[in-house]
Amino acid sequence: MPTLRQPDGVLSVALSHSVVSEYRECDSLPDIDQRVAHALTMEVMLTPKPGLVDRANNGAHRDMDVALFQTSIQAISPWFRHFTDAGYQHANIPLAQLLSQVRPIGIACEQAMLSATKGVNTHKGGIFAFGLLCTAAGWLAGRGERVTQRSLCDSVAAMCHDLVRNELETCSGAATAGEHLYQRHGLTGARGEAASGFNTVCQYALPALQQAIAAGADNETALLRTLLVLMAHNPDTNVVSRGGMDGLAFVQAYAQKLLVGPLDRQALIKMDDALIARNLSPGGSADLLALTWLLYHYPAE
């Protein structure tokens, strides 16, 4: 297990300088913490995003805005290097055993977020998804394997193979919102998406983003269209927790409608108004959009 210490008030993974510098020079892992910060910043600044915090408004949220997201990103970004460090240090153990090794880092990262935001959950889903991805990247680099979209997603799937069974199927009581939604609707949420190797991202979002950019769309237009693709296909538990299965059906059908033809920003603004009126926030899709943007910058295979 990583040795956790508290230098200058920040929890970190204790690794020898030689080991850390060895893999930080790998071409496949340059400044991964900065890459994550860029992806998270891209997501919050992208506008207009129906129901979500952006530069135009706070979406269906009363307790957060762009400034709070930026504060949160600044607080959590250094931790993603710790996930990568831990993956590299434990490259000699099977992926199935790796999740338990990085849980303390995830908990500490969440605490850093909550401390910075005064208790507001801005990035819990992002910490979970990007923490897994960074751990996988370090593990692959430590084994001398290529870091690609496929190897990253396959590694996360192997890490989380038993996550749904261990934390949802065998749960005797609904202690968390995710457990409640699984028991009531059979939705596996972020755990299921990770256990699938981010299947929604790989099957829908990445192809949509690649196709849009290949067709000449600018990054913002391509990302907005990709967000609609995610909203149309992702069984977003953030939406269900606010609006039930009817709310999810509303979001998915609305997104599908807007995907017919070129991207219409005025139609996106109207969708934003509709989701705000119904208090629906597709936060799970927002997390997956940021993840898609990060993965897009790695080779496919």
Swiss-Prot record:
A biological process from GO: prosthetic group biosynthetic process
Span of the signal peptide: none
Domain of life: Bacteria
Alphabetic keyword roster: ATP-binding, Nucleotide-binding, Transferase
InterPro entries: CitG (IPR002736), TriPribosyl-deP-CoA_syn_CitG (IPR017551)
Coiled coil: none
EC number: 2.4.2.52
Catalytic activity: 3'-dephospho-CoA + ATP = 2'-(5''-triphospho-alpha-D-ribosyl)-3'-dephospho-CoA + adenine
A Pfam family this chain is assigned to: CitG
Gene Ontology MF, one: triphosphoribosyl-dephospho-CoA synthase activity
Family: Belongs to the CitG/MdcB family.
Name of the featured protein: Probable 2-(5''-triphosphoribosyl)-3'-dephosphocoenzyme-A synthase
Protein's gene: citG
